[in-house]
Structures are given as structure tokens and as C-alpha cells.
């Protein structure tokens, strides 16, 4: 059986921090599924289709990465792909508190599921999608925070 990991998120938009985690975690798995979440609760700036397209553009050079859109429980998606490991990023203490709760919740829904946490590299530690959204909403230049493939896409906002 293939070693498969899932890296879920809203990716609204995808940032260099996300790509850093994808790069490092893709080396641990035969296949890494990047699962772009519907997430109506977060009121995303970009539609699900736009976020999926941006992620596909940003990850096209990774041979073992597949991008999918999903709605519903992450634990169910993991079962569908026969995945036993979720990949998550941790930047700050508040991320840890939230991710710990989510990890326990996912484990309660799928007992085989483990969560692997990645700390960002120092150069990406401050980057978040919300910072990028704020910069682009104010017509600022966020090109140094996102993959070059998607900057033309987000600069149209």
C-alpha cells in the first residue's frame, strides 16, 4: 500500500509558507494529497474553484502531489484515499491550541489517523493567508509572499 499524506487547508490564497510545507512533506510520502477545503465558515476571498486552480498552478512541479477540492469531514476524505497521516503547519502558539483540538477530533473519527506537524522555516514563519489577503485588499504588493505562478491571479482582485 502506498504511503499517502493529506495536507488540508483553505489556502485562501496559497502562500510560500504552504509551498514550503508541501515541499518538505512531499518528501516523506509516495503521494501527498493537497486538500482544498470548501470552508464557508471562513468566508473566503477566493472561490473553491479559484483556490484549487491556484494550488494546482503552485504545485505543478511536484510529481507526487495531487490537488483536490473537498467539502465535509477530513476524516472521511482520509478514509477515501486510504490515508493515515494528516500534515499540518504550526506557526504560533495559537495554531498549536487549535491544531491539537482538531487532531484529537480527527483521531476520534478515524482511529488510524495521525497528525504530523511542521514548523515553518524562519523565512516563512510570519506568512499567513490573512496577511496576504489584507495586503492585496489594500492594493499592496504581496508578490514576495506567494508563489510566482499565482501572483498574476491574485493581483486582479
From Swiss-Prot:
Subcellular location: Cytoplasm
Enzyme class: transferase
A GO cellular component entry from the record: cytoplasm
Biological processes, Gene Ontology terms: coenzyme A biosynthetic process
Sequence similarity: Belongs to the bacterial CoaD family.
UniProt subunit comment: Homohexamer.
Protein name: Phosphopantetheine adenylyltransferase
Source organism: Helicobacter pylori (strain J99 / ATCC 700824) (Campylobacter pylori J99)
Gene: coaD
